């Protein structure tokens, strides 16, 4: 049974944020081989886990690959497999390749054209390499995905008018507060999404930006870029009272802000409204915070309306991008099928070379002692014959194997025609048997 590429995942379309955070596979709680062991069934694996999707790429043999991934994934999160199954999609072969290329090109993102997903995919690939979880197929596939994403960016306008999740968050704040120049914002977390949010807040005219991060130095570095103020993480709740808008995007595995924490903050603010946007998955802010008076909490799923407006501007460019994806999916499929053909070509050449060497040995035995020049000439002649005799069959197989449906059939015919799977009978035995029949 030949190896194939499988992609098993869930995303913002198939699962709400509550489900996505339950089944998130972040770096701290999972290793690729901890979810799906590398063995005879699964030979390669990569995990992509972001705020909007969790996807597992696997190379393996047979339908057991999918069941093994689902079983390992749910177990890694301490959940039941039947709770995961309703939200999951499964792609195999060309569909898996196509889906990955769409993801890398940001055509499958909540915000089509956003640049973050490519960086997240590269990071996931780097970690998989470090853990020795990728081989020939995933290495080739991921590099191709990166080049497809580059083609989409350079040959279409998909990314030119793209918004990010951070942009959508700031747009939502502007709709609620209107003019931003009299309000202050706090960013919790100092990663890429926080940096983008700071950029958009500054452009919107926010009067002050605070940055709270577990690593104070990183928070101070980000705050310095935007003339903001860095806050020690342990002082977070003391300083929350200074902020009207809070955008949180940490990598925490459980809520860092709860309703009981905000009650005292509100009292010190004299119950002036607070606007929280939680763009982390798992969520940083307990949903119960939204039950407090004068507190407005939005999570990543609430940004869809802002995103939809932006999507309409880019549908035509997305259509051009999908054409590129289809073209590259076909090319990669041809390369993948060529891998299936390679063992047959190698076996055919080795068989021919064995026959040639056996015949050379038999001829030299009949001739008796020959000088080195004669021996070299005989070997060169046989080598040339092997090459020329194999040229047509190999060319034919390569040409026919590029046909997706017919390829495996021609491999099977070739292997039977040339006895490539007959390990018990040496190639020269067939020749001897035929000679014996002819002599009689």
From Swiss-Prot:
One Pfam family this sequence matches: GlutR_dimer
UniProt-annotated site: Important for activity, residues: 99
Amino acids binding substrate: 50-53, 109, 114-116, 120
GO molecular function: glutamyl-tRNA reductase activity; NADP binding
Keywords (A to Z) from UniProt: NADP, Oxidoreductase, Porphyrin biosynthesis
EC number(s) from the headed UniProt entry: 1.2.1.70
This protein's pathway: Porphyrin-containing compound metabolism; protoporphyrin-IX biosynthesis; 5-aminolevulinate from L-glutamyl-tRNA(Glu): step 1/2
The keyword NADP appears for this protein: yes
Catalytic activity from the UniProt record: (S)-4-amino-5-oxopentanoate + tRNA(Glu) + NADP(+) = L-glutamyl-tRNA(Glu) + NADPH + H(+)
Entry domain remark: Possesses an unusual extended V-shaped dimeric structure with each monomer consisting of three distinct domains arranged along a curved 'spinal' alpha-helix. The N-terminal catalytic domain specifically recognizes the glutamate moiety of the substrate. The second domain is the NADPH-binding domain, and the third C-terminal domain is responsible for dimerization.
Record's function text: Catalyzes the NADPH-dependent reduction of glutamyl-tRNA(Glu) to glutamate 1-semialdehyde (GSA).
Further comment: During catalysis, the active site Cys acts as a nucleophile attacking the alpha-carbonyl group of tRNA-bound glutamate with the formation of a thioester intermediate between enzyme and glutamate, and the concomitant release of tRNA(Glu). The thioester intermediate is finally reduced by direct hydride transfer from NADPH, to form the product GSA.
Protein's UniProt name: Glutamyl-tRNA reductase
Gene from which this protein is expressed: hemA
